Regions:
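Transmembrane signal-anchor helices characteristic of membrane glycosylation enzymes that use polyprenol
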Residues: 20-51, 59-65, 246-262, 409-413, ...
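Extracytosolic helix-loop segments that constitute the early lumenal/periplasmic catalytic or substrate-binding loops
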Residues: 35-40, 52-82, 86, 94, ...
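Transmembrane-helix signature of polytopic, membrane-embedded enzymes
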Residues: 102-106, 123-146, 165, 463
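Transmembrane-helix motifs of polytopic, lipid-linked glycan transferases
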Residues: 107-131, 169, 382-385
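Membrane-lumen/periplasm interface segments of specific transmembrane helices
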Residues: 216-217, 237-382
Length: 498
């Protein structure tokens, strides 16, 4: 065992020391776990986004070895074919392991908690590629484990939890490849990207951005890649063949799913009424809403016919939402409606994303708006200032800059290719506009945020004060904010007895 250098001894006297870091991280993880357990135990299944549907699909997938077929039993949950199926397949294969006498809902919620811890862990590992600064590590774990919508979602059954984990893993292993030059890391990143695309369609743009980033960074050294691959294959043996098989299988499954959908239906994700029939689509609340609104906009249904069709939507809230959309579109036809332009859309989009990241948006909402969101905005501006100062000092880290570029590219794609497009179609600003859709890059964003915020000052006392202030803001806007605003409508029977 080698003796510590004088600089290492002095550095370990700063707060937090190595020992203090371990204890504080353990406490933060324990606090995070207890909160997720609270959400898993006490939140009604009718509150988290589409949890009843996710649970129903998992049960359907549990009854077959591979993939199920559409049937009368499945219609109420939408399509079970032609969809991104990986999450439901994994959850379905876990359900037979529930021999503990608890409900399937609670059992799957607890497994989703593990996905959340994995997301936090790989976000921390991503930061370690950038810096070993212990105060920055603490800040990252605080903000990751105290973002309300992420905490709330992590205690529910949702494919977003698996997608978030695969996303941060794909990002981590790609950037680990950039730093360590290990072909194995690159292969794992590609595998995570392929798995993520099978878990949710919205992973596709992230995968494309990651591949584009890899190509742009490695274009000069592309000639050396075959040599590196051969060297890696000789060194790893059977692991190479296993990874290669997994990547080829993932690629084939993606081509079969998305390529098949596009060739047969002209869309990567066809509608239920395109795959089955309009009458069957009325049995699924979201498919019914989309079909009725589309037919009304196209003139295939009159206003009265569209309103009458909504009676087939059994869920009262979804039926009311569909009626509202039809009435709004009809009113705009008569009175006109001034739509926001692409530039004017940016600020309200950002405000709503923040309100539903640091608040909750599900079948009940708890938006964080007004004065309570101001401290977060101030911290974000300070982190931005820290990035500018880091650049001016010449200490701008390449990894941080590329992570910021990645987050920006994904946000722009989400804003315009998804949210703005739906806004123009439905003429409704909040349609499918939810903060959880940015969670695939949340880990990367918080790595940049923590790193640049701690770059703002060099003096340790100022850095510590800023970190404590940021931690107080995030912690207070998570569980305390929820408890202050939650009503009895948020809570249901304990899942073991549900």
């Amino acid at each position: 065992m080698t003796a510590l250098s004088e600089s290492e001894v002095l550095n370990d006297k700063e707060f937090p020391s190595s020992r203090q870091l371990k204890w504080i991280l353990a406490f933060l993880c324990l606090y995070f776990g207890l909160r997720l357990l609270f959400f898993a135990l006490f939140i009604s299944p009718y509150i988290p986004p589409d949890e009843v549907t996710h649970l129903g699909l998992a049960k359907i997938f549990s009854k077959v070895l591979l993939l199920p077929e559409n049937s009368v039993e499945t219609y109420q949950y939408g399509l079970v074919t032609n969809i991104s199926w990986l999450y439901y397949w994994v959850m379905g294969k876990l359900l037979p392991l529930n021999v503990f006498g608890i409900s399937d809902l609670l059992f799957l919620r607890l497994f989703n908690v593990l996905f959340a811890f994995g997301t936090v862990f790989f976000s921390w590992r991503l930061l370690r590629l950038l810096t070993d600064d212990r105060l920055t590590q603490l800040l990252l774990v605080v903000v990751m484990t105290n973002t309300l919508m992420f905490s709330f979602l992590s205690g529910s059954v949702s494919y977003d939890n698996l997608v978030n984990l695969l996303a941060v893993m794909a990002i981590y292993y790609l950037f680990a490849f950039f730093k360590e030059r290990s072909v194995g890391f690159l292969a794992i990143s590609f595998l995570c990207q392929l798995a993520g695309c099978l878990a949710k369609l919205s992973f596709l743009p992230l995968a494309l951005i990651l591949v584009a980033l890899w190509v742009l960074r490695e274009v000069k050294g592309v000639r050396l890649l075959p040599v590196a691959v051969k060297r890696y294959c000789r060194a790893t043996g059977w692991r190479t063949y296993l990874l290669s098989f997994a990547i080829l299988a993932g690629l084939s499954l993606n081509i079969q799913l998305y390529g098949g959908n596009y060739l047969q239906y002209g869309s990567l994700r066809p509608s239920m009424y395109e795959v089955l029939s309009p009458d069957i689509a009325l049995e699924h609340r979201i498919s019914a809403r989309d079909m009725i609104v589309e037919y009304f906009k196209d003139g295939r249904l009159s206003y009265q016919q569209a309103i009458q069709r909504t009676r087939f939507i059994s869920h009262q809230g979804d039926r009311a939402d569909t009626v509202y959309l039809i009435q709004r579109l009809a009113d705009h036809r008569v009175n006109g409606y001034e739509m926001l332009g692409p530039v004017a859309y940016i600020v309200p989009w950002g405000e709503h994303i923040a309100a539903t990241v640091f608040g909750i948006k599900g079948h009940l909402s708890m938006l964080n708006k007004g004065l309570t969101i101001v401290p977060v905005a101030v911290l974000m501006l300070l982190a931005l200032l820290g990035s500018v100062m880091s650049w001016r000092r010449g200490t701008q880290a390449g990894i941080a800059a590329h992570l910021a570029l990645l987050c920006g590219a994904y946000a722009i794609f989400l804003m315009y290719a998804h949210n703005y497009k739906l806004y123009l179609y439905y003429e409704n600003f909040s349609m499918a506009l939810q903060g959880r859709y940015v969670f695939p890059v949340m880990g990367a964003f918080y790595v940049c945020f923590s790193y640049y915020l701690m770059c703002l000052f060099r003096r340790e006392s100022l850095r510590l004060g800023l970190a404590i202030s940021a931690a107080f803001v995030f912690i207070s806007l998570d569980f305390p904010f929820f408890l202050y605003h939650a009503t009895r409508n948020w809570f249901g029977l304990l899942p073991p007895f549900f």
